[in-house]
Amino acid sequence: MADERTGDSVKTRYDIALMNLNDIKIAVFRDSLSTYVEQKTGLTIQFNWPKSRCLVISTLCKIPFPTKSAAELQEMCSLLLCCPERLQLLGYVSVWGEETRDVCLTKTLVFAGEDEKFYGLDFVNETLYLLAETTERFAVLGLRRYDPVYREKDIRFLTKIDDVLQSLIDAQDNLWKFATIVYKNSGRHYIMKSCLENNDGVFVLFLTRKEDFPSRMEWNFFSDVYESMPYHGQVIGSIGKTLLYPKTMFVMMDLSGAIYGIDTIGTGIGSCVKIADDFESFLRQGIVRGYRRYKFFHRNISTVQEILPLCPHTSLGPTFSNNYNYDLSSEDDE
């Protein structure tokens, strides 16, 4: 039996996935996707990431969990999208394996959109994710852009978890305690291995305060941005190649524990893009959604995150300021 970790196995899964997805692309182009789905119902498409999940081609009547009618699903997707787009059902996400194919840990429907785009609909939470912008990219990405996947414990962390990161994970539901831990450990940095983007090779997460920025001219702008942050939450770090290289994104946690990346390229505060549901998921998925490469769709239309969003955190004062007097008299709980 071939080792699942070998390059040949990875290439084989990619080639098979791409072949099946190309058939889907042709069916969409010919406006015959419904016929394709009827003929291929039961076909499983396995991706390289994660290996434990697959796409099962299925008609609506054979989805193994309760859904809505086709018209109701289309209406739901239209509400979730920031612009009108025709979506056609492909099937659902399931666990890989013949014996567990009908086990759906997350009730997720997969749709084919216009211009080769693919979407995942979290049916329970009514949240729509853009999985990929092209057929080839979907074969490469798999479900990397789908939040619930990162709640599974079999998804490895992208950096070594030490006592500080573990304490932050334990405090991710308490922004006050989380910010205090960041304050105490400001200046620490962690290399996060990138399993997806190859432009920079690695990304570095810093637990950084404005006071800890290097005294270099390139950092003056970033200091000004940090000082005037209008976002409701706590800036917990920044991302870049090295400690001396000016950062391209601030990382922020809001009151709900969600992690956002705030673009700092250009002449002002840029896009605010949701990166992860919580800090632990962020350490597993990295910044696959950063740098204007991802759209996040939320059920509340007023908080849609897109390439040029109306950030839901504007016009609200920061929860913690640089001058806040943290109580450092007692040690953190274990």
UniProtKB/Swiss-Prot annotation:
Keywords: Activator, Transcription, Transcription regulation. Isoform 1 is not glycosylated. Pfam families: US22. Belongs to the herpesviridae US22 family. Isoform 3 can transactivate the human immunodeficiency virus type 1 promoter. This is Protein U17/U16. It comes from Human herpesvirus 6A (strain GS). The lineage of its organism: Viruses, Duplodnaviria, Heunggongvirae, Peploviricota, Herviviricetes. The gene is U17/U16.
